[in-house]
Curated annotation (Swiss-Prot):
Protein name: Trigger factor
GO molecular function: peptidyl-prolyl cis-trans isomerase activity; protein folding chaperone; ribosome binding
Domain characteristics, as noted in the entry: Consists of 3 domains; the N-terminus binds the ribosome, the middle domain has PPIase activity, while the C-terminus has intrinsic chaperone activity on its own.
Occurrences of domain PPIase FKBP-type (ranges): 162-247
UniProt-listed GO biological process terms: 'de novo' cotranslational protein folding; cell division; chaperone-mediated protein folding; protein transport; protein unfolding
Locations listed in the record: Cytoplasm
Organism listed in the record: Methylobacillus flagellatus (strain ATCC 51484 / DSM 6875 / VKM B-1610 / KT)
Length: 434
């Protein structure tokens, strides 16, 4: 085997590979001889079919299999020989081949992994959110828990913030229907952010049985992307309007939250402890977002098109799945790949940066860190020990906690390198309630 590599651009390579024919012909003959021992054909006993008939019947198929395997092996060998890291799949083009040629040749065009040069992070500013959980924050959380367990009763007045409504909805873009609720309608609590804010503002002031038609102009950066920059006309019928009736903060409420003896003070302590854990979790999320952005902002990187295209496909599939769950007819939705390229490029860039950094700085999560992450997952379930057992019953299930634990190591590495400053934040801002 011989291979020559041509550099087309920073990442694109063209490799011409020559493979001797004689070993391939020998392999073809060997396979046909083996096949002749077992092949069955009408008019012949098994294994007694003449070799020339077997060759005539199966020769082309066997030759194609041998050639395909030869290309795969030789490409892999040539890549290793030339110390190339292939990104994505190669495009293979076979050169013309005459019967007596001593070699077959093909041209493989592909991209290689880029160099990842992570810059100086010492000037990258990262703000560490600071929030102390006090009585006011606990009270807000208790109010949320009470609202979550509210019962609702019909009212004849117009709808307002906090009411539960059921609506039937049809949405149009340029007079083409893009969304329609089913016969059960759509349940919403006004003001809880279930839809775009401008949409929710139209839901107040309407009585059960009324109808309202209005338009919403979505911004260019709206998610999901198919509504970005579009004006949507909504035809909404208000089926029901119900007001909330909150439960009392008492022993019965405590028991509903799992405090078996109904001790209200114990319930308050558990809520406080849980809230502190959630605040710590939100702070870690904010730090991770900033750490990853610092890496993106300080890394020179050209991303292979193959990686971007693969990520675009994944994002489109994810968006389609999300729309299906919402009852949107995908036949009326055109998800242009260009809508996803910016996010796909960011995702692919970050993946390359993290891979380089983890390998360079040896940041892979160890067994103890993975175990700690599994324990964190398990605490969300009623029987955490069973969840831990489930994860360790199949090592593939540990991939997700291992990846998240490794990301935590990356964040810690960035925080040690960057300029980190503490910043006091409001409870509602941190919890996403504002």
């Amino acid at each position: 085997m011989q291979a020559t590599v041509e550099t087309i651009s920073n990442l694109e390579r063209r490799m011409t590979v020559s493979v001797p024919v004689q070993p391939l012909e020998s392999e073809v003959n060997e396979r046909i001889n083996r096949l002749a021992r077992t092949v069955k054909m009408p008019g012949f006993r098994p294994g007694k079919v003449p070799l020339n008939i077997v060759r005539q019947q199966y020769g082309a198929q066997v030759r194609n299999e041998v050639l395909s395997n030869a290309v795969e092996r030789s490409f892999s060998d040539a890549v290793e020989q030339n110390k190339l890291r292939v990104a994505g799949y190669p495009h293979i083009e076979h050169k013309p081949y005459a019967e007596n040629d001593p070699q077959i040749e093909y041209v493989a065009t592909f991209e290689v992994f880029p160099e990842v040069n992570i810059g100086d992070l010492s000037k990258a500013k990262i703000e560490r959110p600071v929030l102390e959980v006090g009585e006011a924050e606990v009270k807000k959380t208790i109010d949320v828990l009470l609202r979550q367990r509210a019962t609702f009763e019909p009212v004849k007045r117009a709808s307002k913030k906090g009411d539960k409504i059921n609506i039937s909805l049809i949405a149009y873009i340029d007079d083409q229907e893009v969304e329609r609720t089913d016969e059960n309608g759509l349940d919403l609590i006004i003001g809880e952010g279930g839809r775009f804010p401008a949409f929710e503002s139209e839901l107040s002031g309407n009585k059960a049985g009324s109808n309202k038609v209005f338009e919403i102009a979505y911004p260019e950066d709206h998610k999901p992307e198919q509504l970005a920059g579009k004006t949507v006309r909504y035809d909404v019928t208000f089926n029901t309007v119900e007001q909330a009736k909150l439960p009392e903060f008492d022993a019965d409420f405590a028991r509903s939250l799992g405090v078996e003896d109904g001790d209200v003070e114990k319930m308050r302590e558990e809520i406080t402890a849980s809230l502190k854990q959630e605040v710590e979790k939100r702070i870690r999320v904010k730090l991770k977002e900033q750490a990853f952005q610092a890496l993106l902002d300080n890394t020179a990187l050209e991303v292979p098109k193959a990686f971007i295209n693969a990520e675009v496909g994944r994002l489109i599939q994810s968006t389609q799945d999300n729309l299906k769950q919402r009852g949107v007819d995908l036949a009326n939705v055109n998800l242009e790949p260009a809508l996803f390229e910016e996010q796909a490029t960011r995702n692919a860039s970050l993946r390359l940066i993290l891979s380089e950094l983890v390998n360079r700085e040896n940041l892979q999560a160890n067994a103890e860190q993975v175990r700690n992450m599994v324990n964190v997952f398990a605490q969300s379930f009623e029987r955490p020990d069973d969840v831990v057992t489930w994860y360790y019953a199949d090592t593939k299930r540990l991939d997700e906690p291992a990846a998240l634990a490794t990301e935590d190591n990356v964040v810690e590495w960035v925080l040690k390198s960057a300029n980190v400053v503490d910043k006091k934040v409001k409870f509602d801002d941190l919890m996403g309630n504002s």
